[in-house]
Amino acid sequence: MKAATFLSAFALSLGTQAAEPLDIGSRWELFVDEFLVASQKGLGLKLHEPVRREVVLTTDKPWEGPTCGYFSVIQDGRKVRLYYRGSAGGSDHSDAQVTCFVESEDGIHFTRPKLGLIEAGGSKDNNVVWRGVESHNFAPFLDSNPSVRPEERYKALGGVKLPGKNWHQGETPGGLYAFVSPDGVHWKKMKTEPVITKGAFDSQNLAFWDSTRSRYASYSRIFSNKVRAIQS
């Protein structure tokens, strides 16, 4: 009886031993659940809500319209750059959508540079850097790849699932297109075909250089059994 009791207690102690700590190295980890938490006492996970502050930009120009969205913020040296969609509504596949650009030195006071690149709102006297269906969700990033070429310091993804109209290329296949720019203002496609074709692409599709894995990564929306999901 004593031997059986000892063996049972020993087995129980093995079953309740704490698991070995997970080695995450230098990776950043997002605490969205308790997977990385061994124990907690007197605390809990809480999703913090954003607090509305002062308005720093009003999208009231003729080429911007009432359905601006998908804002991307990039800090390049002393400049804070903000990219967003200009649209008066309508189809996601319209070539009337534009990508706008403003910049600031403090992240509060933004100015619209008069670029003179693309006609929108009846004039080229605007801050538009791209026009076409890809502007529906054009999302740029500053490439931190140590081997990046100077003429490709900025990169972006943009596009929708179904074929759409492009301002100067006619109808283009559906999917996400890759863009490059030396300065964040003058953009061109890396290739004429989309680089990702499987997905919904109806939201902001994010890409970046993953220094941990030494490769580019992208996150976009997809529907799995009619349920919204994220793919990478």
Where do the PLM segments sit?
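Sec-dependent signal peptide recognition
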Residues: 1-9
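Hydrophobic h-region of N-terminal signal peptides that target proteins for export
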Residues: 8-18
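Beta-rich carbohydrate-recognition and catalytic domains
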Residues: 19-205, 209-232
